[in-house]
Swiss-Prot record:
It comes from the Bacteria. It comes from Oleidesulfovibrio alaskensis (strain ATCC BAA-1058 / DSM 17464 / G20). A motif ('KMSKS' region) lies at residues 236-240. InterPro entries: aa-tRNA-synth_I_cd-bd, aa-tRNA-synth_I_codon-bd_sub2, aa-tRNA-synth_I_CS, aa_tRNA-synth_I_cd-bd_sf, Glu-tRNA-ligase_bac/mito, Glu-tRNA-synth_I_codon-bd_sub1, Glu/Gln-tRNA-synth, Glu/Gln-tRNA-synth_Ib_cat-dom. This is Glutamate--tRNA ligase.
Amino acid sequence: MSKVVTRFAPSPTGHLHLGGARTAVFSWLLARHFGGEFVLRIEDTDMERSKQEYTDSILASMAWLGLDWDGEPVYQSRRFDLYNEYIDRLLAEGKAYWCECSPEEVEAMRETARARGLKPKYNGRCRERGLQGGEGRVVRLKAPLTGKTVFTDLVKGTIAFDNSELDDMIIRRADGSPTYNLAVVVDDATMGVTHVLRGDDHVNNTPKQILLYEALGLPVPEFGHVPMILGPDRQKLSKRHGAKAVIDYKETGLLPQALVNYLVRLGWSYGDQEKFSLDELIEKFSTDNLSRSAAGFDPEKLQWLNGQYIRETPDDQLAGLVRPFLAETGYGQIDAAFLTVAAGLYKERAHDLVELAAAMKPVLCADDALEFDAKAVEKALTAEGRGHLAALRQAFAACADFDGHTAHEVLQRYVADNGLKFKAVGPPLRVALLGAMGGPDLSAVMGLLGRERTLARLDRAAAL
């Protein structure tokens, strides 16, 4: 196989959304699987809606997801001269023509066709008139009037369009700017793109683009159209389904590898395997396993998967990842070694970094700033519970050395010597140390806090 070149071509009229990100992931994986190239094009010809802030956001989102691209991004807004060269060639070769029909006249033609039960389209009035350029005139491609345009879609199989139903599409607008389909064809050809993966809302553009490739004598890439992502109600995914822009998922504490894994599984499968490393995805990815059916977005499954990735992240790496989220709540300067242990203690139940940062607060806060849950205090800090805490305080203070292992031994000995069950001492100790009934292993918590802070918290609980 010759070198595979894929592309991702977002429009900077908004932030990168999940559908676009999935397309980018599929295209990136296909290129990396074959050791090819993945190129990036910014389709910014809509001058009114395109904004630099969206371009920056898209590039940042791609980088965060780990989707590196080859070469520099190509910007359509800087290539108008190139597009016009190709349009002028089509005009010179008689494969395109000038048209003076107004939008109102074209709409009237379409209405007439509808009334006759025909495909609504431009009727070719200017096709053979030999007009020259002039104010208000557009350039149209001479599409074949008979036959079919057929291509083998990498996802959907063979797709055929009757040429009689295709328009003589506009390739240059009256203001001199190229249209979407013309620009895309010129770009993909000059960028060496061999495979185009995109959403199936582009299927109807494909025959038009194939006709342009053929008219220009350019090699036609392979096309694959993936079904859209649906919400739980089987409607097109939108914000009302809980979907966010990619940059928002970063800010809410998702790990990029979890989001990439989840997006890949929305439309691609490899047996029953759910979780993949990036290297596994590159090795196993194939367009043969892309689904023809639309996939449903499940935010709860995404959170579950992210939790799996959090638990597998080494504690020191996780500490670095969660630190920016702690900084937002005033805990950004925590000692690295302390934070590493704390992250390891709390990661088992966290689904995202925001949740992890919030859960860690009881061990990060100052001892005199620990917040107590009133119901937990009432339930656990009874006279009996306070008695156990007082006795345990004496035992902890008397230890020659103090760490998590020592704390565990003291607890075990106290329970055994007094004929107790752990549930008699666990809840009051947990409330004293963490302010609530839930949390990680108590011995590990005391090892993290150290003797001085453990005793300080026991003293504060005794004074409640």
